[in-house]
Amino acid sequence: MSEPKLAINEIFYSIQGESTWSGLPCAFVRLKGCPLRCHYCDTSYAFSEGLKRSVTSIVEEVSKLDTRLVEITGGEPLIQPHVHTLMEALLDKGYEVLIETSGERDISLCDKRIHRIIDIKTPASGAADSFLETNYDDLRLNDEVKFVIMNKDDFDWALETTKSQQLIGRVRAVHFSPVMEQAGNSDIAGAEALCPELLSGWVLASGLPIRLQLQVHKYIWPPQARGV
């Protein structure tokens, strides 16, 4: 039987720019492919670019990077069934593993040791109907939830979702992140930036312990830079 393979867009070592691990050195494994076309997507190159690699070769490359923190991302990593083999291989070697997913696929299939970061799509994203509603039932304290906010309507929707799903206390953290300017291309519509100061005011007025999240890596390197 041949070894499981995954379509990999890139593997790189950088500063984690999001989540409660923000600021830490991290190895990133970016998988190819995504069924969504969010207007503000900053990794649309991962929709179609990538090469098949064995799980063993992926783990070997990660082992050469000077960190025990690994994030599996995309694209949408859960569209590739063998991603679960990769998760288990990394976890079994003692890595702390994060996976970022849109929640479009069943998150309950993920190894219980992993930290799931669920990026729930808002109405203005262009993919609001993509979330698998049963995933709310599987959320746990090991998880984090992120909403990328494009405007006040998005904020209000995300706030209501946070309340109705009782996310505060159910997950490790709830992040609200402002959209950064994104040019459109043949795959995505593009988006205008939301002022972080504006979002900060909305978060403060909410009275909830929501985390304002800025993409740290985009303040270090050019926003369109790859491999960071």
Give the predicted meaning of each segment.
Residues 1-32, 36-40, 205-211, 220-222, ...:
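Flexible, acidic/Gly-rich N-terminal and inter-domain linker regions that tether
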Residues 32, 74, 149:
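Conserved residues at beta->alpha junctions
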Residues 6-13, 25-28, 36-115:
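Conserved Radical SAM active-site core
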Residues 20, 41, 50-53, 70, ...:
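Short linear functional motifs in flexible/disordered or boundary regions
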Residues 78-228:
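Conserved AdoMet/S-adenosylmethionine-binding subsite of the radical SAM
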